[in-house]
């Protein structure tokens, strides 16, 4: 069973958990190339800007954390397995109750339409996963998160492992050594998400 202290220690040292749903195991990952979103240069695409300006979604934080993490854990059309196991869900629910894990939610007509969750430590936000039930809902939540982190003075938005979706949102890859320097700088900040 993963403990809260295990998660906090691992993230401070550049590791994060991934479950293998077939094996029922959890591995600790520390990729050589780390995906991060540069907070100072992120700009939503024109099409996303239009969706944001239309006000299709209402953004809320931490009102449906468990719903968000469980939606993120659902298998995707292209991936039949999920890396978010019940063990990971349980420890992140504890982290949420401690005020360390947070959800950003897009709501539409009173229904949860999409969102994301992650872990906040110092000036670092570790984006864990995102999901959507309605088109662009997770992207709107992501754009809101970036703006919010900027305003609060965060310096690191860790996206962990690059994929085409993250790249389309402006994520870049940096070498492990550079990531660790950025992480150390971010963790030294006295910032709280809420």
Swiss-Prot record:
It is found in: Cytoplasm. GO terms for biological process: protein catabolic process. GO terms for cellular component: cytoplasm. Pfam families: Leu_Phe_trans. The keyword Transferase applies. It catalyses: N-terminal L-lysyl-[protein] + L-leucyl-tRNA(Leu) = N-terminal L-leucyl-L-lysyl-[protein] + tRNA(Leu) + H(+); N-terminal L-arginyl-[protein] + L-leucyl-tRNA(Leu) = N-terminal L-leucyl-L-arginyl-[protein] + tRNA(Leu) + H(+); L-phenylalanyl-tRNA(Phe) + an N-terminal L-alpha-aminoacyl-[protein] = an N-terminal L-phenylalanyl-L-alpha-aminoacyl-[protein] + tRNA(Phe). One of its GO terms (molecular function) is leucyl-tRNA--protein transferase activity. Keywords: Acyltransferase, Cytoplasm, Transferase. Its EC number is 2.3.2.6. InterPro entries: Acyl_CoA_acyltransferase, Leu/Phe-tRNA_Trfase, Leu/Phe-tRNA_Trfase_C. Gene3D superfamilies: Leucyl/phenylalanyl-tRNA-protein transferase, C-terminal domain. Its main location: cytoplasm. It comes from the Bacteria. It is an enzyme of class 2 (transferase). Functions in the N-end rule pathway of protein degradation where it conjugates Leu, Phe and, less efficiently, Met from aminoacyl-tRNAs to the N-termini of proteins containing an N-terminal arginine or lysine. NCBIfam families: aat. Belongs to the L/F-transferase family. This is Leucyl/phenylalanyl-tRNA--protein transferase. It comes from Chlorobaculum parvum (strain DSM 263 / NCIMB 8327).
